[in-house]
Regions:
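Short, solvent-exposed polar/charged micro-motifs at secondary-structure junctions
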Residues: 43-45, 198-202
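Mixed-charge, glycine-accented linear interaction segment located at domain edges/termini
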Residues: 179-200, 207
C-alpha cells in the first residue's frame, strides 16, 4: 500500500475564546455568530473579530473560531509574535501554562489576558481508523514530507492527534506554509522506514545514536 496523502491546511492567526472573555468584549449574553464550518467537525468561523495588541504592534480583524473554549487561546506564527513584541512559545493547543498574554480589543472594549498566546506546534488530526492504517499512536511525533511545487520540505516534530471527532489533515501556520510554497491543495506523506514502519523521531534518534556508538 502506498503512502496515504494527508491534506495540509494553513492556519492564519486566529483566536479561540472563552465565553467569559467573549462577553467582556461583546456584551453579556452575546453568542458567537456562525459564518461557516471549518474542516474539523464541530469547528466554525465566527462573524465577530478582534484586534490583538502587543508591546510593539497590533493585528486588526483577527478571526474568532468557535465553539467557545474553556480558556482563551491566541494562535500566531513566529513572525507574528515578533511583529507585536511577544515571546514565541511553541505549544500544542490547550497547553497555555507559562505563555505570554496580550490585549484583546473589540470596539471600545479591551481585555488583557495574562496568558494564552502560542505558536501552535504543527500537527496532524486523524481518526483512530487512520491511526491503525498508519500504525501511529496519539501524541507520537513523526516526519512529514510535503508534496508541493519545487520546494518540498521534510517537517519533523509533527504531533499526531487522534480522535473520532477529527478529520484527516495536517495543520501548519503561515510561516510553515510559505516555506514549502503551498499550492492550492497541498498534501504530505508520513515518511516510512525501509521495512514499512513509520519513521518516528525516537527511531531517528536511536539510529543516530547507534551510528555514534559504532
Amino acid at each position: 500500500m502506498g503512502s496515504i496523502k494527508i491534506p495540509i491546511e494553513t492556519s492564519a492567526r486566529h483566536i479561540h475564546i472563552s465565553r467569559e472573555d467573549f462577553e467582556k468584549l461583546f456584551g453579556e449574553g452575546k453568542e458567537l455568530t456562525f459564518v461557516k464550518e471549518l474542516s474539523q467537525p464541530g469547528q466554525y468561523l465566527a462573524k465577530e473579530r478582534v484586534t490583538i495588541a502587543g508591546p510593539r504592534g497590533t493585528f486588526e480583524n483577527v478571526a474568532i473560531l468557535g465553539p467557545f473554549r474553556k480558556e482563551t487561546q491566541v494562535e500566531l506564527s513566529l513572525t507574528d509574535t515578533r511583529k507585536i513584541g511577544v515571546a514565541g512559545v511553541i505549544r500544542q493547543s490547550g497547553d497555555v501554562a507559562d505563555t505570554p498574554g496580550c490585549k484583546l480589543i473589540a470596539g471600545d472594549r479591551e481585555l488583557e489576558i495574562e496568558r494564552g498566546v502560542i505558536v501552535a506546534k504543527r500537527h496532524i488530526h486523524m481518526t483512530p481508523g487512520d491511526a491503525v492504517k498508519m500504525r501511529l499512536k496519539d501524541n507520537e511525533e513523526v516526519f512529514v514530507i510535503t508534496q508541493s511545487f519545487d520546494r518540498a520540505l521534510i517537517y519533523a516534530n509533527v504531533v499526531v492527534r487522534i480522535s473520532w471527532d477529527y478529520r484527516l489533515s495536517m495543520h501548519v501556520d503561515t510561516d510553515e506554509a510559505n516555506a514549502f510554497a503551498s499550492d492550492v491543495a497541498p498534501t504530505g506523506a508520513i515518511l516510512k522506514l525501509f521495512d514499512g514502519q513509520t519513521y518516528s523521531l525516537q527511531q531517528w534518534a536511536d539510529e543516530i545514536q547507534s551510528g555514534i556508538n559504532r
